[in-house]
């Protein structure tokens, strides 16, 4: 990366899904070539999100958990407490990135983080995300608009995985989910969030970051 402008890493705490999705869209629509890139670390209240390719039959029994149809790639997944979301709001041209390269970097930042805990995680060529023993620990879904990315990844850290049984996760019937705590990996968002953000920046050649709490007033 040739640009020396710091990437902002924003710690947003626990938030409802819809306002953060709206903020991502507003940020992407209003940014220009001089806007700083940002990475958002956030934890969501329980919600199912249905991607652009989503099919209703994969929503088995959502019950009292709301379903939001969103503009990312992929099928249905679940977000909730104890899961680390990392949203990547990047100007792809600035970083010399193609979409596939960004997806690979997102997968690698999880694989590399878990490797430090002696957990053997891996991506799958035909099903984006990160897996351990055929169980999924991280889901990935992106949207590119005007050459800029938004959405990102969801890493199961220390959470109630039961809501995943109400759907076919990512469109795969019977796909088992797992979290980092079960694997002996990082057991809190306070540890996992900064670790994966640091790994991603390293993989993308981002040398300068600026850490912030919450949104600017």
From Swiss-Prot:
Record Gene3D superfamilies: Bira Bifunctional Protein, Domain 2 (3.30.930.10)
Subcellular location: Cytoplasm
Marked site (Lowers pKa of active site Cys) residue numbers: 136
A GO MF term: lipoyl(octanoyl) transferase activity
GO BP annotations listed: protein modification process
Pathway in which the depicted protein is active: Protein modification; protein lipoylation via endogenous pathway; protein N(6)-(lipoyl)lysine from octanoyl-[acyl-carrier-protein]: step 1/2
GO CC, alphabetical: cytoplasm
Residues annotated as binding substrate: 72-79, 139-141, 152-154
Claim: Coiled coil is one of the keywords in the record: no
Record-linked Pfam families: LplA-B_cat
UniProt entry keywords in alphabetical sequence: Acyltransferase, Cytoplasm, Transferase
PANTHER family xrefs: LIPOYLTRANSFERASE 2, MITOCHONDRIAL-RELATED, OCTANOYLTRANSFERASE
Remarks, miscellaneous: In the reaction, the free carboxyl group of octanoic acid is attached via an amide linkage to the epsilon-amino group of a specific lysine residue of lipoyl domains of lipoate-dependent enzymes.
Name of the protein: Octanoyltransferase
């Amino acid at each position: 990366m040739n640009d020396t402008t710091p990437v902002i890493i924003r710690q947003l705490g626990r938030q409802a899904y819809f306002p953060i999705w709206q903020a991502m869209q507003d940020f992407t629509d209003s940014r220009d070539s001089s806007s700083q890139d940002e990475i958002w670390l956030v934890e969501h209240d329980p919600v199912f999100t249905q991607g652009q390719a989503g099919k209703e039959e994969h929503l088995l029994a959502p019950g009292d958990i709301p379903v939001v149809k969103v503009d990312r790639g992929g099928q249905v997944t679940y977000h909730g407490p104890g899961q680390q979301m990392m949203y990547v709001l990047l100007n792809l041209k600035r970083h010399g990135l193609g979409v596939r390269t960004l997806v690979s970097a997102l997968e690698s930042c999880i694989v590399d983080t878990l490797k430090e805990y002696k957990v053997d995680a891996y991506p799958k060529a035909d099903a984006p995300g990160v897996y351990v023993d055929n169980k999924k620990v991280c889901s990935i879904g992106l949207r590119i608009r005007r050459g800029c990315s938004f959405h990102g990844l969801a890493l199961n850290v220390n959470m109630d995985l039961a809501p995943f049984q109400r759907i076919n996760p990512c469109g795969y019937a019977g796909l088992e989910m797992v979290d980092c705590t079960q694997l002996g990996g990082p057991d809190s968002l306070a540890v996992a969030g900064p670790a994966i953000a640091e790994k991603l920046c390293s993989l993308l050649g981002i040398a300068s970051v600026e850490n912030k709490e919450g949104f600017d007033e």
